[in-house]
Swiss-Prot record:
Localization terms from the record: Cytoplasm, Cytoskeleton, Actin patch
Protein name in UniProt: Altered inheritance of mitochondria protein 21
Statement: the UniProt record of this protein carries the keyword NAD: no
Keyword Phosphoprotein: yes
Membrane spanning stretches: none
Function: Involved in mitochondrial migration along actin filaments.
Gene: AIM21
Endpoints of the signal sequence: none
Result of knocking out the encoding gene: Increases the sensitivity to farnesol.
Other facts: Present with 450 molecules/cell in log phase SD medium.
Pfam families, sorted: Aim21
Keywords: Cytoplasm, Cytoskeleton, Phosphoprotein
Length: 679
């Protein structure tokens, strides 16, 4: 092996420092990179103080970038979608006829030198244009059988402009012949080279088209259009005099005309291959321009043979254009606005009404027919199938059968018992109703009055002959106990209480002695006893007293009242002890109120009271007659004042006694209710 060579490790590339803010173009940066070598890093790279400025994404930068790229152009007219159900045979026949006509036209007009060499190129250009048009329009132009294609227009245009195109072409040929006679051999060789190059290009194109187009399909070729374009580029159709002047110019510069033709051909090819969408829009515009040019050519003076062809072409073009517009669904704009016919409009309005009437009549007739058909009975085509018998239940087992029999017997017994009991009860009820009907008629009024007594009772008020239901139950309970026998009472007592529960514990063992020795407390339901007694009692005793001469007239009036109260018999007082039949003596009431609460317990405190009462009784026995008392009262005004004071004091005392010392009546009522419930 050769001696080992140590490989050289390249240095790490470093970023080149640039003082420019914006980067250079691609070519300049490439040259700089090729010429300059990466510098060796001296140390740590310097951190830039400013951030590089970015390009502003404005409309100017956007537009500058978009100018370089070719933007697609929007066509002027929207392409019309056509159906693909047409037969291809019609298309083939039409194209074959058009090709034959084009060949006949080309054979008639033999163009010398330049025209012969131009014709194949123009034909091939027309083929290429037709191929791209068919690709973009989805074979729409080739499938129209009735409407004339743009080739027919070009044929008529070629027929109309043949003479106008022949004259400048002949002039060009003459000029070329004159140039060839006077020019040197070098010029001839150069022309031959150019023509040979054009022929080679035409051959290549034809070979390319044969690959693209199938053998059965024939392509529409627009020869007259290309011939006219070539003639227009060489000499615009502005009359015969202008063509003669321009023919002289072409004789002077034959080479320039060839170069212009070549440029024109190349431009067309680039348009066809680059912008097929633009071609569609330009073809429609070119067709319009050709129609205008045809009208101008027709206006020029021509021979008799040419005029006949032009007339035929125009006559054929007009219906073909209308047919093409109908099939392509292109709207036709009329020249004048149509006038409205009022009569026809009225007829149209009347027609739907009549139609609606007819439709309604037909509907009514159909409804009537259906109703009649529904009424007619129809015999069914097939007999209804009989229902299958129900499935036989399985025999139950012996136990189930015995259980069912037992249930049936019990149900039958219950029915018999219920029937007998209901019959007996019904007969008893009927007998009771007859007996009770006479009794109820008499007692209804009494029951009604008795019910009213308890409706409007105030709190604390109880009827003497009626007790509340709770008291009646409690009072009647000892009677029921006496009726029950000793055995029934023992059974009732030994019955389980609702509140007691069975103690949880071990079942198979005896309870401990402490728990077993505990006696159970038995609650007696009927231990409550009720006692009725009077809460308060008022007793009044009156006696005759002798009135002394020194007594005042007020004391005399009091004594007179005491005497009146004595005249009431004592029997009435015993019958109604709770009622106050006469007014009490005000002095006695005052003395009773002033007594302390423990006055009854002290017997000594009652002695002076008894003495005072005895003295008063002695004074009252010697009382004056009422006539004398009245006479004495009229003489003295002081007696009237004292009487008024006494009356006021008595009213206050009576109110205090009735209210029980309460300020409000509601509080007194509540206290009465509380005392009643405590009973």
């Amino acid at each position: 092996m050769p001696s080992e060579v140590t490989p050289k490790v390249p240095e790490r590339p470093s970023r080149r420092k640039t003082s420019e803010l914006f980067p250079l173009s691609g070519s300049e940066s490439g040259d700089i990179k090729a010429n300059s070598e990466p510098p060796t890093p001296a140390g740590t790279p310097n951190v830039p103080t400013r951030r590089p400025i970015l390009k502003a994404k404005t409309m100017t930068s956007f537009e500058s970038g978009m100018d370089q790229e070719s933007l697609p152009k929007v066509p002027l007219q929207r392409p019309v979608r056509r159906s693909t159900t047409e037969e291809l045979n019609n298309v083939m026949n039409n194209t074959s006829k058009e090709l034959e006509e084009i060949e006949s036209l080309i054979s008639k007009h033999n163009i010398h030198n330049v025209s012969r060499k131009k014709s194949p190129t123009s034909v091939e250009e027309g083929k290429v244009a037709a191929i791209h048009q068919n690709g973009q329009r989805s074979a729409s132009d080739n499938k129209t059988s009735t409407n004339p294609s743009p080739l027919e227009k070009n044929e008529h245009e070629g027929a109309e402009g043949n003479e106008s195109a022949i004259s400048p072409s002949n002039l060009v040929n003459k000029s070329n012949n004159e140039v060839t006679e006077h020019s040197d051999s070098e010029d001839l060789t150069e022309k031959q080279k150019v023509h040979a190059a054009l022929d080679n290009e035409a051959g290549d194109r034809s070979h390319f088209e044969e690959k693209l187009i199938p053998g059965d399909m024939k392509v529409q070729v627009d020869v007259s259009k290309d011939v006219e374009e070539g003639s227009l580029n060489a000499l615009p159709p502005s009359g015969i005099t202008e063509s003669d002047d321009k023919a002289e110019k072409f004789t002077k510069h034959p080479e320039s005309s060839l170069e212009e033709l070549q440029k024109h051909q190349e431009q067309q090819e680039e348009k066809i291959f680059q912008n097929p969408t633009d071609e569609e829009s330009t073809t429609s515009l070119n067709e319009k321009q050709e129609g205008k040019d045809n009208m101008e050519v027709n206006s020029q003076p021509q021979g008799p043979s040419d005029t006949e062809t032009v007339i035929a072409a125009t006559s054929s073009n007009v219906p073909s254009q209308i047919a093409s517009e109908e099939e392509n669904d292109v709207p036709v704009i009329p020249r004048s606005r149509p006038k409205k016919d009022f009569e026809a409009h009225v007829q149209k309005e009347e027609l739907p009404n009549t139609q609606e009437k007819r439709v309604s009549e037909e509907c009514d007739s159909t409804l009537i027919s259906t109703e009649e058909e529904s009424k007619i009975p129809k015999i069914p085509s097939e007999r209804p199938k009989r229902r299958a018998p129900p499935p036989v239940p399985k025999k139950p087992s012996s136990r189930i059968a015995a259980f069912q029999e037992m249930l049936q017997k019990q149900q039958q017994q219950d029915l018999h018992n219920n029937g007998n009991s209901s019959a007996t009860t019904a007969s008893a009820d009927i007998a009771k109703k007859h007996t009770d009907s006479s009794i109820t008629s008499d007692t209804t009024k009494a029951d009604f009055t008795s019910k009213l007594n308890g409706l409007f009772a105030l709190p604390g008020m109880v009827n003497p002959g009626q007790l509340p239901p709770s008291l009646e139950k409690k009072l009647s309970s000892p009677d029921t106990e006496s009726k029950l026998g000793p055995q029934d009472q023992s059974q009732a007592k030994t019955g389980p209480l609702g509140g007691t529960r069975r103690g949880r514990g071990p079942r198979g063992r005896k309870l401990p002695s402490k728990v077993a020795s505990v006696e159970k407390i038995e609650e007696d339901d009927n231990t409550n006893k009720i006692e009725i007694f009077n809460n308060w009692n008022v007793s009044s005793s009156f006696s005759k007293e002798k009135v002394l001469i020194d007594t005042t007239p007020g004391e005399q009036a009091e004594r007179a009242l005491d005497e009146k109260s004595k005249s009431i018999p004592e029997e009435q007082r015993e019958q109604s002890p709770n009622k106050m039949e006469a007014a009490l003596c005000p002095f006695e009431l005052d003395e009773k109120e002033k007594l302390p609460a423990n006055a009854e317990s002290d017997p000594l405190s009652q002695l002076p009271q008894t003495n005072a009462v005895g003295n008063r009784k002695a004074i009252s026995e010697e009382s004056l007659s009422p006539s004398e008392a009245i006479a004495n009262r009229d003489q003295n005004d002081t007696t009237e004042i004292q009487e008024q004071q006494m009356e006021d004091q008595m009213e206050v005392d009576m109110e205090r006694e009735l209210s029980g010392g309460y300020e409000d009546v509601d509080s007194a009522l509540h206290s009465e209710e509380a005392s009643f419930h405590s009973l």
